[in-house]
Amino acid sequence: MVKIGIIGTGMLGEAVGLHLLDSGYSVSVYNRTKSKTKNLEEKGADVAELPSVVAESSDLIITCVKDADAVKQVLFGQGGVVSGKHDDMTVADMSTINPNAAKEISKKLHDEGIKSIEIPVMGGPNVAIDGKLVLMASGDKESFERFSK
């Protein structure tokens, strides 16, 4: 089964994580404020100390953080996803960022050999926990097909 990592467990990231756990997925999580991972940990998620640790154990990493700077930090900063990368890993960004930043981040991931999908969403935590978010995905077609099942 696919192993999923979630970086950013605020209201939306937590709701997505809870839905994935309820659906039987193996989930690991990271959040700067560790207390925001408590509900997910209680439901069975593994809590990582760094984004790189999430990357090491995940096939798909979902970022759900506050802005483009935060996305860049968790991906490319010290202890970021890139330092834990492995073959056949995909990053799916659900953060609310502008299209130019999304393109820049996608290019940097590609340069690192990491596949990426940008996934702006419509709907909030209540919709996410029920698995009914509206997703507008773009990016690596092979990864989209692999993880949309």
Predicted features by range, described:
Residues 1-56, 60-63, 89, 94, ...:
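NAD(P)+-binding Rossmann beta1-loop-alpha1 motif at the extreme N-terminus of oxidoreductases
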Residues 4, 97-149:
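Rossmann-fold dinucleotide-binding core
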Residues 10, 34, 65-68, 99, ...:
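Alpha-helix N-cap/helix-start capping motif
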Residues 16, 36, 50, 70, ...:
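Hydrophobic alpha-helical segments typical of transmembrane helices
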Residues 17, 41, 72-76, 148:
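A short local structural element in Rossmann-fold oxidoreductases
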Residues 37, 71, 126-130:
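A short acidic, helix-capping loop that chelates divalent metal ions and anchors anionic groups
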Residues 42-45, 62-64, 109, 131-135:
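Short low-complexity, flexible loop/linker segments enriched in glycine and/or proline
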Residues 51-64, 68-115:
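Rossmann-fold NAD(P) dinucleotide-binding segment
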